[in-house]
């Protein structure tokens, strides 16, 4: 009878049987459980590159050929401290397969021709041995073009054995990644075929057609006890943690004065840490280096990245791609922190002013520094586009919840933490047109002044249009009657003033219409009331006025119709507009008090008592007529605006001397809204409130 092991092998397929290994077979080919090379290629690749992946447990190797000692029956895992590294020369074909070498423990005489990077016609140098620690190393190069050139001594001496003969001339192509970048990355498994090796390589490399590679790379920074850190450029999804770096020398040329001005602006921001304040200094030093001569690719300021408590100097391209390590151990490695650090030294040196609580300013006017460049009188296509323009149109009282806007500031002035910080008298520090990011804060912009003179404050601005001027808006008169804004007539204003009590109708005659000093505004000169008080106001050309016997009119009827869908006539010199003022005011203050302050001009939707509140919504004394009477209220506008929290702008001469009198007069006025009207408007659910 046959032995037991012979009978068991007969039941196995031929490939599973343990065939005896003869010296002829060993001399002819070298075989491995996971890699096989034809015998015809063995002689050509007998001294080629050794590439082996993570072998499975219990994998057997059979060795032989070219003077190598035959070692059989040994597992690969038994050679845990020996690594064999061989790298192709500089003539490596760019169209070759990916040069990803995943080192695994190998015996000293293990010599196998690998099909992973096999390329006919290329000679590879002899193999060299290096005593390396048990941790696996991974060298990643580009499959599309020549990878980075490694500077001398790229491997720290503690990693190499003193007797190791590893010349750096044989390792010109591979860039080591730091251990912190390889913590979360697992080496790709060994593939039995070259086509399988493409699965992992593109995620860690970049095509040469997208971004140019460096001809030489120097370490960006060295951490104590770590290998040099190199950043590889990639536009593809990162399989390994990559930091994008620009082409060599793509940095701006800035004067020391500009860097100093940015430093002072950053130092004025009290919320910065000392490390963040050092960014500008480090940036200035890097820009003054010889490598700062650019290739015309825009501003690329140097940015510091905080990784695992170590400060690494990187570079930031116009397309910022900063990735955090795979396993973030500390908050400093978060992507949000790196973005904040990048924003502090961004291209235009924008200073982000901390958004503060609004404080009462002397005039309580939301002043915005105007856009001195201005723009043409072309009409916007819609109200949303109007808000995105350079604030030359649609200037209305500002909502407190507006997003941050970009606004140019006067020369040599920077807003930091809500305060104007002079950065010097040199006019070249901050050229006109350079954008400064300023938080939308009323008290900040109310104090914004030019260093040379004190001009007239700009009119109140807003990026939202008042909804009560929109066609179809329902207006409640002081008599309780509801009308659409486009259906209002002169008698509606007269009756509302009579019923309200304490009010009187005044006529405001237009005597002159001029262009304002502020872009996008017109200055209207009126003669108001019996005292013939001369009043001048600045309003947007699309602002509607109510003219006796004519209806709504504006300086730009077409634009008013486009923005509000409200039919308008053209306002001309000699037109008499409706204005309502308080009867209790003396003659010398009528022209100032008949218009309420911006805080009092909000629609009744904001008022808790929903009462009819007088001429604050009917008109202002400069000839601007409100769309309804004393109790005008927007009940259901056809085009609601989220930011329509106030009516039109108060004039530049507005003062608050009569604010208390108007408040007292409002408290004396009863509500003229019947209960039936309330139920019809608000619904039955609010009847008990």
Curated annotation (Swiss-Prot):
InterPro entries hit by this protein: Ataxin-1_N, ATAXIN1-like, Ataxin_AXH_dom, Ataxin_AXH_dom_sf
Main location, first listed in the record: nucleus
SMART domains registered for this protein in UniProt: AXH (SM00536)
GO-annotated molecular function: chromatin binding; DNA binding; POZ domain binding; RNA binding
Gene responsible for this protein: ATXN1L
Function: Chromatin-binding factor that repress Notch signaling in the absence of Notch intracellular domain by acting as a CBF1 corepressor. Binds to the HEY promoter and might assist, along with NCOR2, RBPJ-mediated repression. Can suppress ATXN1 cytotoxicity in spinocerebellar ataxia type 1 (SCA1). In concert with CIC and ATXN1, involved in brain development.
Region of interest (Interaction with NCOR2 and ATXN1), ranges: 20-197
Region (Self-association): 20-197
Keywords linked to the UniProt accession: Cell projection, DNA-binding, Nucleus, Phosphoprotein, Repressor, Transcription, Transcription regulation
BP GO terms, sorted: brain development; extracellular matrix organization; learning; lung alveolus development; memory; negative regulation of transcription by RNA polymerase II; positive regulation of hematopoietic stem cell proliferation; social behavior
Subunit details: Homodimer. Interacts with CIC. Interacts (via AXH domain) with NCOR2. Interacts with ATXN1. Directly interacts with RBPJ; this interaction is disrupted in the presence of Notch intracellular domain. Competes with ATXN1 for RBPJ-binding. Found in a complex with CIC and ATXN1.
Compositionally biased region (Polar residues): 28-43, 200-219
Domain AXH: start-end pairs: 457-588
Record field: compositional bias (Basic and acidic residues): 1-19, 273-285
Phosphoserine, modified sites: 284, 361, 615
Gene Ontology CC annotations of this record: dendrite; nucleolus; nucleoplasm; nucleus
Taxonomic superkingdom: Eukaryota
Region annotated Disordered, chain positions: 1-46, 185-223, 242-297, 357-405, 617-647
Species whose genome carries this gene: Homo sapiens
Cellular compartment(s): Nucleus; Cell projection, Dendrite
Transmembrane intervals: none
Free-text tissue specificity from the UniProt record: Expressed in cerebellum and cerebral cortex.
Keyword Flavoprotein: no
Name by which UniProt lists this protein: Ataxin-1-like
Skewed-composition ranges (Low complexity): 257-268
